[in-house]
Swiss-Prot record:
Protein role: Sodium-independent anion exchanger which mediates the electroneutral exchange of chloride for bicarbonate ions across the cell membrane. May be involved in the regulation of intracellular pH, and the modulation of cardiac action potential.
Compositional bias annotation for Polar residues: 440-450
Chain intervals with Pro residues compositional bias: 1-11
Keyword Membrane appears in the UniProt entry: yes
Source organism: Pongo abelii (Sumatran orangutan)
Residue span of region Membrane (anion exchange): 709-1232
Name of the protein in question: Anion exchange protein 3
UniProt feature, compositional bias: Basic and acidic residues: 58-75, 267-279, 481-498
NCBIfam families per UniProt: ae
Amino acid sequence: MANGVIPPPGGASPLPQVRVPLEEPPLSPDVEEEDDDLGKTLAVSRFGDLISKPPAWDPEKPSRSYSERDFEFHRHTSHHTHHPLSARLPPPHKLRRLPPTSARHTRRKRKKEKTSAPPSEETPPIQEEGGAGVEEEEEEEEEEEGESEAEPVEPPPSGTPQKAKFSIGSDEDDSPGLPGRAAVTKPLPSVGPQTDKSPQHSSSSPSPRAQASRLAGEKSRPWSPSASYDLRERLCPGSALGNSGGPEQQVPTDEAEAQMLGSADLDDMKSHRLEDNPGVRRHLVKKPSRTQGGRGSPSGLAPILRRKKKKKKLDRRPHEVFVELNELMLDRSQEPHWRETARWIKFEEDVEEETERWGKPHVASLSFRSLLELRRTIAHGAALLDLEQTTLPGIAHLVVETMIVSDQIRPEDRASVLRTLLLKHSHPNDDKDSGFFPRNPSSSSMNSVLGNHHPTPSHGPDGAVPTMADDLGEPAPLWPHDPDAKEKPLHMPGGDGHRGKSLKLLEKIPEDAEATVVLVGCVPFLEQPAAAFVRLNEAVLLESVLEVPVPVCFLFVMLGPSHTSTDYHELGRSIATLMSDKLFHEAAYQADDRQDLLSAISEFLDGSIVIPPSEVEGRDLLRSVAAFQRELLRKRREREQTKVEMTTRGGYTAPGKELSLELGGSEATPEDDPLLRTGSVFGGLVRDVRRRYPHYPSDLRDALHSQCVAAVLFIYFAALSPAITFGGLLGEKTEGLMGVSELIVSTAVLGVLFSLLGAQPLLVVGFSGPLLVFEEAFFKFCRAQDLEYLTGRVWVGLWLVVFVLALVAAEGSFLVRYISPFTQEIFAFLISLIFIYETFYKLYKVFTEHPLLPFYPPEGALEGSLDAGLEPNGSALPPTEGPPSPRNQPNTALLSLILMLGTFFIAFFLRKFRNSRFLGGKARRIIGDFGIPISILVMVLVDYSITDTYTQKLTVPTGLSVTPPDKRSWFIPPLGSARPFPPWMMVAAAVPALLVLILIFMETQITALIVSQKARRLLKGSGFHLDLLLIGSLGGLCGLFGLPWLTAATVRSVTHVNALTVMRTAIAPGDKPQIQEVREQRVTGVLIASLVGLSIVMGAVLRRIPLAVLFGIFLYMGVTSLSGIQLSQRLLLILMPAKHHPEQPYVTKVKTWRMHLFICIQLGCIALLWVVKSTAASLAFPFLLLLTVPLRHCLLPRLFQDRELQALDSEDAEPNFDEDGQDEYNELHMPV
């Protein structure tokens, strides 16, 4: 190099501009003589001779003619690129002398010993890039990096040649030229003649024009080796590049190029290299040293590996997002500040201006114009990706400088824009949380802030061009009417920044979320809008900016004048909504340049809907929007799935598998299916034991939580109420042979055993309506055949055990897959109708026994009848015991009607209250879940307060005793008690055993199937074969002790699982609730069954319950179960016009008359079952119910298409865990 000038490290930055006066200073004689020699060599006449005398033409070689257009095309191609000659020099930090240390001194001494001959004093050695000197410097830098940065560089003694260095600030000392580069420059003419000449200098003399340019640059700038060079002087706005008019000319300051190139080449270079591209990352590529070893050389790889270790890997993994929109507003004292107006976790929440409270979450609706303006803003604004800043002032400083360079704002607006970005932030919750000490963070004046981030270099008296920091001066007023703008409270880090944070909001934000801050507003000092999109290199916590302490990764700034047509609020909502979109914010994390962001906006527009500007009255007009949006989302998911398939096609992952896992699906293998047949005897049972019993220790540990205690209390009342209700009704059906005490004991014993040994201990074992119907039918059959009812139940139980063992051995539980909602709806509808019918039938019997008469018998006769029909405890005796019950009692029928309807309406109202808007969600759930016990307690108190009216009470024995102690005991003899049991009935008992097995199989397996849904996230698995074996085997034992058969109660089991479900708290407002975990354990089931068993000691309290209250509970169970069946909903559509039909798949995808045909088939099956149940063959109704399964799979496919059957008979109901959602009765198709 001729001058030894070292370019700055940012090689991609624009070259600095040097104002060269037209007047050239006089040159020395030596310089003129050297320029004459070079001018003769490169004279224009010499090139003219070469052009005028072309070489001899060879006809054998192909040739073509070149025109002026070809030369012009060559100048503008990529091959016509001029690299500065000074780019071959090492970086400036490699040329700085480090302070001497003992280790470095030892290495240098060792190196001098290996050198053969020292360099000459007259000719300094040339330091070649990649040579030994550079390698030594690299090693020293790698080992003593921190030491060299911390210790100041001591200047060498005067008189020794030094390396030229660049200075970032203006406080560096002047340094002489660079040794070893022949960089001994000529001083100015006023200094004196040149005294030192080197051979290298004489061999490469510059031209007079370049020499004049160099000398002029030394006058006008601190460019000469005797002055420090400031990199900030090279930074200039793009508008200054086109300033070619005037008496001065702009040329590059690279002296090597100025000496070697002509004016035409310099003009061409300016068009390519003197322009600035804001927001584009320039990566410095260092050429490897020629003296380094090869790839296999450890010495050559060691520095590279050390360098790679020091570089921190960027985390471009997409995180959950939290977006906050802040707008520039004026407070009551007319001072500007940033005010939070909206936020996004998934949906938009706006701050209501009048009440200063948050509105309901909703889907953000954007204008199409704002999206187009946002796209144009990002295309022409500043884009700073991977910005390495950790404070808001540092970020704001770089944003403002980038805006100036990209010609968005003027340099004189720097202070105002920076002051605007650093204003304080306020949030709607600040006033609520601040209390007596409101938050008012302030900082020092603007001068100190700008002084920290804009150090002003000291310029000499040589008239150098000032840098950007010189343009700040005194801060101008931010607002024209506010003269005290310098004292505005600014945002500064530190202090109690998040004192007003909302802990409730923080719980709804995911733990790994990163925030996006959107700042928009109008300012009076700008002439055009200015915008910047910033992505930080690493998410940082900016104090007092956000409402909650969430690290910030993205910032979007948009400032502009108010007289433009830009709606800054809508533009801020647009970028905030884009950042809350899943696909766009993933693209923002992985974007490498501006074009990636624009492509993501286009992808967002492809999935958006434009609503025409027409008045919309009513929600019915917007029904098609939701369907169209679902179709667009489906296509969008298909495109994403296609991308996943393309990326995983060459790997081991199946296509679409990763997408399903991301969407929340589970990777289920065929071995995990509990209903999969193994082909071996008891193979399914063995798999259930191996799957579930290893979790037995955790089933005990997981119960150590307060939520399990609350679930025990709640499910206890939920299980006790049906036990009392069905016990009282069972005593009525069996004439007192089995009643409340037997059902309570059976529920307790079987519940404890099943909870300890079952594969799914969350199932609640209890009595159900179908079993009550079967018990009534079997009792009538035994009375008709003059058989002992309890002895017949013993043989039915023994055959039940045999059939259950055979079914489990054959792995017959897989048959539950064939029981579709078609059969479940028929089953549930039939049982609900039976409940409702039995309730009003019992009420009719009460009105028959106690009619409303105009005259009643005398009071003495009434008391005598009462004394004859009542026991000392006031309970009514069974019809078969003693004298008949009292009849013709006044007001008994009316009071029974009031008690029944009162119980029904209280329980039904509390159930509706659970899904209302009053109180909080937890309070409503507690009141709704205890609706049945509350209604029973209220009506019992009403009956207890009315002392002069007779009502029939519940029959409960004293202590642990059977209901009729004089008729039976706790053990039932299999051969008969009063008379021998006929042998033919011992064999014929297999038929009712098979029928009761159908009921137990359907209820138990369907309940287990509902509980084991993937949406409920049970992790320990289930066992259909083991559960069926336990319930069937324990049912056989119940027959020996005269206890009722039990099954898995659907509603109580689902309620038990819901009570043990833990919901995620980090759910965006308005989003669907999600399950975090379910506390799967065995202790709650054991405690619930034990408490139900201990309730037998409350005989005195239970004997106060009127039977009319139990009839009200019976009516409640029938009505609520009927309301949740889809068949009843479709049945109402027959009486409804087609225009009022709901938007359901069975309405939109099936013709109306074919839907009614499907309903008629189901109603025909229900009518047939009702007829069978009402005749002497009522015992066979489970068999007819089972026939609906082949009817669905064999006959209906001939009448309906698969598409129609999928819409009419599909199990698409998912559990609803919303506090304001539906309860268990509306989710299930099973009877109570």
